Amino acid sequence: MPTNLKGGVKLRKALREFSPDLAKETIKELGGLLRPVTNKARGYMPAESPLSGWAVRPESKAKFPMYDPNIAKRGIRYKSSPSRANRRGWRALVSILNTSAAGAIYETAGRKNPGGNFSPRLGGERKGQGKLEGRSIFRAWNEDQGKTQGAVIRAIQTASVKFNNRKAKV
């Protein structure tokens, strides 16, 4: 899933500063590429609470997030703004994430100890390996087989070429 693309963040900043219309066009194009994967991932979220005791209760004061399928599905979204650099200096130009707590738990549950039987009732086939393993987002990305990733890279490269052509004309 991760791809090393040098100068991507600098390109986005330069586009925003010198060619805002091209920056908006690029963001719109990236959104169009990521939207089908997010919609497919939403389809993999269970319609009911996958575990007993995880369903929403009317008068519960529990702090642990309860599973509401609508909130979990709405929580899957894409982000087209660059992330902060991690301790190794890597940044994500675009990402797909689950912003709901219960949805994120469902996505990654059982990843820490894959040899153990976390809960067979949780269901959902996990796809990917290691930290890039999950039940909905990673499964949708895995089924996409890198088509979206290649299209995103091409979109960024196209924006770079257009920007350089505009810069050369000035």
What do the predicted segments below correspond to?
Residues 1, 12, 23, 62, ...:
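Residues at structural and domain junctions
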Residues 1-20, 130:
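Disorder-to-helix initiation segments
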Residues 11, 15-18, 30, 137, ...:
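Generic hydrophobic secondary-structure signal
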Residues 13-127, 164-170:
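Short, low-complexity, charged/polar segments at coil/turn and helix-coil boundaries
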Residues 114-170:
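Lipid-handling modules and contact-site tethers
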